[in-house]
């Protein structure tokens, strides 16, 4: 039903406009019954109703948490949130590649800023006792010099940790100039240390790029162990492109969805061996319950999706948890 509607209606709309329409529907989903609580899953000291989460980038401003929870997501990672509000990159900046069940985005961390989003999360928690696990993905503002990046991450941690269940440090988006340079350990160490110092003891994850070399990923894993952080989110979007003649593949930005699955699994296997006892959240190319089970069998503790939700619709998370 949804796939037919997607092909007839949503596919013809600008991808970002369609996203805003979908967000309106999801906000109404907040009126649906709360999902049935199965046996909770304990990860990083947090109780999840299931292992399926919404990846960062879908709910940038913490406006859809209740609706996504009622659609079956056990956790929602909002953001990326920066210290100051910013509009992001010029439009168009979101593109579908339906033949590949993929998206390309160059959004550029458009968000309302840490103070406004912190207040929104505060109100949400005051008004609702039953919520999913809420992760807050944090980053630096576009105009902040790389040498000043630790201060941006520290500011976000101070403003948001109180209302987050966990923090995710984003140093891997391809859409903020120079951001990926912060994955080098000499740059990453002060960022992670200052986030830890300002996190109120909340679990901290590092979101990494699939385009990093295996050695660079192992260096990040070593740093996570040294600083005793909770774990890693693998992976963000990729700047590589699969073979194909689709016009959208020429657009710049990060590619997500089915073409990312192979590299995402490679990174998962690599990091599971390097991070015994740490939490790994696997992201990238997950579409079916079989995909979820494969990631769990490879050592992931939780999984996240975004593009799969776009292509398979509002019932997707519940289908995954039912094993369909």
Which residues does each PLM region occupy?
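A gly/proline- and charged-residue-enriched helix-loop-helix capping module
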Residues: 79, 84-130
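Active-site glycine- and acidic-residue-rich loops that bind
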Residues: 141-153, 181, 206-225
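Catalytic cores of alpha/beta
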Residues: 61-68, 212-226, 273-275, 286-303
